Amino acid sequence: MTLSAAVDNGQSGYPWLVFLHGFSGDRDEWREVGDAFPAWPRLYLDLPGHGGSADIAVQDFAGVNTLLLATLNSYNILNYWLIGYSLGGRVAMNFACQPRAGLRGLIVEGGHPGLQDAEARQARRSNDRAWAERFRRDPLAQVFADWYQQPVFASLDAAQRESLVALRSRNNGATLAAMLQATSLAGQADLRAPLQARDFPFHYLCGERDAKFRAIAQALAADTHIIHHAGHNAHRDNPAAVIACLAQILAS
């Protein structure tokens, strides 16, 4: 089994750019950024429970890793960068912490490397369970209206929230709930040590108005890039700055 994907072919000799979206997003989330790199072959994935992969279910990150590897193999992708936002960033970090032939580098935007104590894990497990119940039960527009009131989205204005609620409400609540719990931060390993021991470039992007993830970035063994005029979803808030940042990374 493989994940649903869209492909843009580039020129021979360039590594692939493999894009992973955030929770409730889909393969189109990174398209504006990816379109700025026409020479590079690009793979845009739908994660389990999302978009064209909505009917694919996993139990944990190991299941996501298996699907991601099978998908890369199905396209004969042997030389690539992983680029992920939020949930997609966590998927990318988890995947990259196992030996991966052909992985050229890791670029994460606003992805959490993992909780560090049992109390925080239990609190997150309860929180994710409550959200999952709402995604299964309530109208999605109502759930996302509350979802985007969470502190991590504090930089959004009313119009931005309204736009995101409309966009995300196209999803399937039951499959989102399943993926939310399967990839809960409560069940994710703390990846700081394996990321520090890595043998590939690791770049971490976060919006200047994203206080939570700027603090997380300071404690990561990564090259950190602050995206100006942006909050948690930096590539949506300021795509031009993210494109410029990626261009600099990929040229180095």
From Swiss-Prot:
Protein name from the UniProt record: 2-succinyl-6-hydroxy-2,4-cyclohexadiene-1-carboxylate synthase
Family: Belongs to the AB hydrolase superfamily. MenH family.
NCBIfam families hit by this protein: menH_SHCHC, PRK11126.1
Catalytic activity, EC: 4.2.99.20
Organism: Klebsiella pneumoniae (strain 342)
Subunit (UniProt): Monomer.
Gene of this entry: menH
GO biological process terms, semicolon-separated: menaquinone biosynthetic process
Lineage: superkingdom: Bacteria
PANTHER family: 2-SUCCINYL-5-ENOLPYRUVYL-6-HYDROXY-3-CYCLOHEXENE-1-CARBOXYLATE SYNTHASE (PTHR42916), PROTEIN PHYLLO, CHLOROPLASTIC (PTHR42916:SF1)
Function: Catalyzes a proton abstraction reaction that results in 2,5-elimination of pyruvate from 2-succinyl-5-enolpyruvyl-6-hydroxy-3-cyclohexene-1-carboxylate (SEPHCHC) and the formation of 2-succinyl-6-hydroxy-2,4-cyclohexadiene-1-carboxylate (SHCHC).
